[in-house]
């Protein structure tokens, strides 16, 4: 009986630490899924704690920005900023806007990068 309780507790604790699938919708109703649907507060907390989810967030943002960059005829928005610069931008955005979604921060980053690329 004790073994069952210990096993159940271990499984429960392990499952509780697995990030849940998240989703969000933009103003136009388009669905977004993954870590980007979480709050900027969660992003900041994850990065400050150097939690395992930190990599999930950063890779989600990298994929979001890269995908939007590849799926356009606009100028390449990633020629002037490296990975660390992108993450620093989102860090700053999320610290200033803890209630916003990570998706919103990533979209604002893309908007900023597009504006910079068009000025060149």
What are these regions (language model features)?
Residues 20-24:
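Boundary at the C-terminal end of the N-terminal hydrophobic targeting segment
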Residues 6-16:
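Bacterial N-terminal signal peptides
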Residues 98-120:
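C-terminal partner/receptor-binding element of secreted or periplasmic proteins
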Residues 15-18, 120:
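Intrinsically disordered, low-complexity linkers and terminal tails enriched in Pro/Gly
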Residues 26-92:
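Short N-proximal segments of mature Sec-exported proteins
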Residues 1-5:
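Positively charged n-region of N-terminal signal peptides that target proteins for export
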């Amino acid at each position: 009986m004790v073994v069952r309780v210990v096993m159940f507790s271990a499984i429960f604790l392990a499952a509780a630490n697995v990030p849940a699938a998240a989703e969000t919708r933009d103003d136009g109703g388009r669905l977004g899924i993954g870590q980007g649907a979480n709050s900027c507060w969660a992003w900041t907390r994850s990065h400050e704690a150097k939690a395992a989810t930190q990599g999930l967030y950063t890779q989600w943002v990298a994929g979001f920005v890269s995908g939007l960059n590849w799926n356009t005829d606009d100028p390449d928005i990633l020629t002037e900023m490296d990975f660390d610069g992108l993450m620093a931008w989102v860090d700053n955005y999320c610290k200033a806007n803890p209630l916003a979604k990570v998706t919103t921060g990533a979209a604002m980053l893309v908007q900023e990068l597009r504006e910079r690329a068009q000025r060149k």
